[in-house]
């Protein structure tokens, strides 16, 4: 589980500092591996070797979207669904994170 504390300025001009959570379970990683031609690692190696910005941008979005969720109040569940993802993607935090990953190799590698 990756917890990212991000400070953003929302669309109303209010500065907000909030925690955002990202996690891929072993099952989700396995599914990505098995449903990617040649495997996930080979695909990442191919994209980085070709320095394909288009494919890299698609990969960042896929990873963000598959890993974002919210913790249940009791901490037992990590909730990921279309509504949770749509809510996050409509924030400035999503925009800032995507931009940072797409434009900063070190940030992308750390994520």
Question: Where is each model-derived feature located?
Answer:
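Intrinsically disordered, low-complexity boundary segments flanking structured domains
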Residues: 5-10, 51-54, 84
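Acidic, aromatic-enriched beta-alpha/helix-loop junctions
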Residues: 28-62
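C-terminal charged interaction modules
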Residues: 72-111
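Homeobox/homeodomain signature
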Residues: 12-14, 37, 58, 78-79, ...
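Generic structural signal for hydrophobic core residues of well-folded globular domains
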Residues: 47, 67-68, 101
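Short, structured surface segments that line ligand/substrate-binding pockets
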Residues: 53, 58-78
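Short, charged/polar N-terminal "headpieces" of proteins
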Residues: 1-42
């Amino acid at each position: 589980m990756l917890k990212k504390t991000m400070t953003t300025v929302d669309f109303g001009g209010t500065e907000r500092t909030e925690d955002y959570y990202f996690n891929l379970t072993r099952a989700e990683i396995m599914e990505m591996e098995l449903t990617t031609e040649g495997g996930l690692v080979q695909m990442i190696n191919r994209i980085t070797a070709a320095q394909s910005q288009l494919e890299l941008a698609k990969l960042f979005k896929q990873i963000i979207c598959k890993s974002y969720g919210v913790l249940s109040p009791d901490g037992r569940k990590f909730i990921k669904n279309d509504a949770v993802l749509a809510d996050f993607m409509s924030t400035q935090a999503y925009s800032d994170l995507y931009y940072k990953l797409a434009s900063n190799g070190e940030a992308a590698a750390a994520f």
